[in-house]
Swiss-Prot record:
Protein name, per record: UPF0298 protein BH2594
Pfam family, one: DUF2129
Family: Belongs to the UPF0298 family.
HAMAP family membership: UPF0298 (MF_01126)
High-level lineage: Bacteria, Bacillati, Bacillota, Bacilli, Bacillales
Cytoplasm keyword on record: yes
One GO cellular component, as annotated: cytoplasm
Keywords linked to the UniProt accession: Cytoplasm
Compartment(s) where it occurs, according to its Swiss-Prot or TrEMBL record: Cytoplasm
Length: 92
């Protein structure tokens, strides 16, 4: 199975009754009733076109992209905690 890179976006709505219509643009991961937003995942290649389509709807207040693909997850100077090192050596 071939997997594609996906990117998340938060779509803020005026009313949650329109959340169901967003399924045709990607995978609806989460719907917040209190804050009225939907977390939507779509292919990375189609992010810009999907974002433009979503912003054209009357029920969409705002669309924000997830910055997770751009955040560095490997740290260069990550040092282990000294207290944890000694805990593992207690039994030896």
């Amino acid at each position: 199975m071939l997997t594609s890179n996906r990117q998340g976006m938060a779509v803020y709505l005026t009313s949650l009754k329109f959340a169901r219509q967003l399924r045709r643009f990607g995978y609806v991961h989460y719907v917040s009733k209190k804050m009225r937003y939907v977390v939507l995942y779509c292919n990375e290649e189609a992010v810009q076109t999907t974002m433009e389509k979503l912003q054209s709807f009357h029920f969409v207040k705002d669309v924000q992209l997830s910055m997770r693909p751009y955040v560095q997850t490997e740290f260069q100077n990550a040092k282990p905690d000294k207290a944890k090192e000694y805990d593992y050596k207690m039994g030896l």
